[in-house]
Amino acid sequence: MSKRSDSLYVRDIKEAIEAVFSYTRGITLDDFKLDRMRYSAVIREFELIGEAVGSLADTVKKNYPHIAWQDIKDFRNLLTHEYFGVDLEIVWNIIRSDLPSLYETIIRIDKETTSDH
């Protein structure tokens, strides 16, 4: 089986971030914490982001050292293996403070990896 291209992993990350934004648009932290279906969906998207980041070539990640790639993978591992201990306020804060800048970078990477082919 052949390895997927970096451009596909970047696209996966982009789509997962867009899904998180969609799932959390127009709600408060309290709304989020009370809606199990919504926060479960968000957590799943973060798991997908972490998996895709883990599959990106190191050469791609080295071009964007301002992104905490290892932290993204570590967060995925926390969500996957410590599900019952997940602090939804931390998830919410990451959505509000870290995800927008990651999204901007992913859009740039997407344009670059798409134009390479």
State each model region's role:
Residues 1-117:
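Solvent-exposed interaction patches of small proteins and small membrane subunits
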